[in-house]
Amino acid sequence: MTSSEAASPGATGRPLTDFEQVLLGVIASEPRSGYGLKKMFGSSPASVYQPSPGALYPALRRLAGSGLLRAEEQVSSGRRAQRMYQVTEAGLAVHLEWLRKPVVPETVGAELGQHLMRFSLMEKYLERGEVIAFLGDLGRALDGFVRGMEEFIAARPEIMRGHALLALEHGIAIHRASREWVGTAMAALSPMPGETSPVPGG
């Protein structure tokens, strides 16, 4: 399965793409129209899941056809009818399964953007302990990734030089910085002594 595919299948058994999972998460937080989603993604500084022209509406239709979204026509005074999308119970179940998908150490480099997006969508639905456990797994996977890249360079001193070496060092720096962020996030989310863990969304 590629990094663009999510493990949770829809009603048709087809694995959802990460973008479709992001759509489920965004719509689960608030019913939205296709136009509203287009504006939201267009104004977001994050480019990882900005849909290409013509990709958004087919994705919404696929999710609705799979029973993961429900569409309702709404008419406001003086405005054209809008199709508002809401997540169904089946859609929410599929989305929660995706949020809880384990971090795979072997693919953490390719899937780092997906993991960060999942983290951003966890706040509403997962207990803080689950989120901290996810971050712990992510941190360990990043440690292994950085260590593996460093060992790769050390084992090939005769060819790891020039631009190739600089490019790999960039990858190491990026993932080491991500590992440092994981530690900061875990510290920020860890309860203080005597503090109880809030319910999801709290």
Language model features: what each stretch is:
Residues I172-G194:
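Short, contiguous alpha-helical
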Residues E97-R147:
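Amphipathic alpha-helical dimerization/coiled-coil segments
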Residues D18-F19, Q114, H163:
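Alpha-helix N-cap/N′ positions at the starts of helices
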Residues P193-G201:
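Short, charged, intrinsically disordered terminal tails
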Residues G148-L168:
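Acidic interhelical loop/turn segments
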Residues F134-D137, G162-S178:
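An accessory alpha-helical subdomain
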Residues T2-G109:
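Basic helix-turn-helix/winged-helix DNA-binding cores
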Residues L142-I153, H175, V182:
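Non-transmembrane amphipathic alpha-helical segments
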